[in-house]
Design a protein with these regions (language model features):
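N-terminal phosphate-binding caps/lids of nucleotide- and nucleic-acid-binding domains
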Residues: 1-170
Length: 170
């Protein structure tokens, strides 16, 4: 279920930032509005996603990190289960804008509640931008819970603090 990976805006940000790091990003920008319930954007300058791989990336258990079973013994990336993107797009209105380093033109892909809306060419730099709108719009009970929860900004801040300490210490 989508709730396994996506519990709140902070979990969306965590998953997308980890994807950015795994893509070799040197710069990652995170923007949120209303604690992330109405708008989140994560932009990176990583390698981008190949156009041919975009739709597959949103399928449950799809991952670019495991090619053969023995890869599971040597995973050095932050994410590998292939759950995050499928879960995020199932409970939000998602737009992906990406260009792989080996491609001349980028791609914009929009999904609304797990349903594809558009797949078009896009002029964009190498890297990836995820725009997440209306988190849990199609799960009213979860959306209502989040509207009452004013602590998500603190959770996001705590995630960033722990992440930076883990990544940049020593």
């Amino acid at each position: 279920a989508a709730g396994e990976v996506v519990e709140r805006p902070a979990s969306v940000i965590k998953e997308l930032v980890e994807n950015s790091i795994d893509a070799g990003a040197k710069n990652i920008t995170v923007e949120i509005k209303n604690g992330g319930t109405t708008f989140m954007r994560v932009t990176d300058d990583g390698c981008g996603i190949y156009r041919d791989d975009i739709k597959v990336a949103f399928l449950r258990h799809a991952t670019s990190k495991v090619k053969v079973e023995s890869d599971l013994d040597s995973i050095s990336t932050l994410g590998f289960r292939g759950e995050a993107l499928a879960s995020i797009c199932a409970v939000s209105r998602l737009q992906l804008i990406t260009r792989n380093v080996n491609e001349e033109i980028g791609t914009s892909y929009e999904i609304d509640g797990g349903e594809e809306q558009s797949f078009d060419d896009a002029g964009c730099p190498v890297g990836t931008t995820f725009v997440i709108r209306d988190l849990f719009y199609n799960i009213p009970a979860r959306a209502k819970f989040l509207k009452k929860d004013v602590s998500d900004f603190c959770i996001l801040f705590g995630f960033w603090k722990r992440f930076c300490e883990r990544t940049y210490s020593g």
